[in-house]
Amino acid sequence: MLKIGIIPNEDKDEELKYTRILVDSIKKCGGTAIVCDDIALKLGDKESNINEDNIVDMSDVMVCLGGDGTFLKAARMTVVKGKPLLGVNLGKLGFLADVDKNDIENAVKRLVEDKFTVDERMMLDTVIVRDGKIIAEDIVLNDVVISRGAISRILHLKTYINDAFMDLYPGDGLIISTPTGSTAYSLSAGGPLVEPDVDLIICTPICPHLLYSRSFITTADRVIKVVVAESSSHEAMVTVDGQNGYEVRGGDVIITKKSRIRMPMVRLNGKNFFDVLRGKIYDRGESMK
């Protein structure tokens, strides 16, 4: 019996409408739905005593309901346990979520019948070093964004690949992205689209004050080192997957490289990357008319 853990976003799932559909579908198909006690109580189950911290350990597969932000948050919970994650899209775009909210029942049936594949997505490890000491470290599915702080001043970032100086970027910052993250902030900043099953690292400047500055791509075995120039007297920010933020200052070093951990993502629909890309971008354009 397949045990399916559920991570809902209550802000996007009003009155837990789609979470209810998901739980009912799992039971109908002969699986076991696992939710934390707070959610279970709102669904009418007064006997559940499952702590949120234990859901991943108790599950074979995880399902989250929300947008890409919800998926990224859930991924941080599941990847360390090696559990595959499926996203149900309740947001507007949802590049990471594979299932439409109106197709939940069919998706559950495919899960229970073992009719799915698992993509192993490349991730990044990033550390922040100050005065020779690591002050923060994190794992990345989409991107690391080094950006100016609240004060609107140019940020100067010295960028190295394997300790070889690459360039000095004056501007609003720099995005270091995985192929999975190529459809996110990097794309908005003019970065390239990359198929998610390719292992490489993308670096995209944010509003660079240069005539020649463009994104660049390097192989996944390289180490990207970014030094916040000492002349940057104001603080800057390092944001990881839009989830965690760290303040940095002049002289701090951000080191990013390929992680040994890969993110297992459930795939059901069989569409290739370009089919999904065309559909998502086109649908959003149509909805804005």
Curated annotation (Swiss-Prot):
GO biological process entries: NAD metabolic process; NADP biosynthetic process
Top-level taxon: Bacteria
Keyword entries, A-Z: ATP-binding, Cytoplasm, Kinase, NAD, NADP, Nucleotide-binding, Transferase
GO molecular function, one term: metal ion binding
Enzyme Commission identifier(s): 2.7.1.23
Residue positions binding NAD(+): D68, G69, K73, N142, D143, R153, D172, T183, A184, Y185, S186, L187, S188, Q243
SUPFAM superfamilies (alphabetical): NAD kinase/diacylglycerol kinase-like
Entry keyword annotation includes NAD: yes
Positions annotated as active site in the UniProt record: D68 (proton acceptor)
Enzymatic reactions: NAD(+) + ATP = ADP + NADP(+) + H(+)
Leading EC class: transferase
Gene Ontology CC terms: cytoplasm
Cellular localisation: Cytoplasm
Cofactor(s), by name: a divalent metal cation
Family, as annotated: Belongs to the NAD kinase family.
Function statement: Involved in the regulation of the intracellular balance of NAD and NADP, and is a key enzyme in the biosynthesis of NADP. Catalyzes specifically the phosphorylation on 2'-hydroxyl of the adenosine moiety of NAD to yield NADP.
PANTHER family: NAD KINASE
Name used for this protein in its record: NAD kinase
Species this chain originates from: Acetivibrio thermocellus (strain ATCC 27405 / DSM 1237 / JCM 9322 / NBRC 103400 / NCIMB 10682 / NRRL B-4536 / VPI 7372)
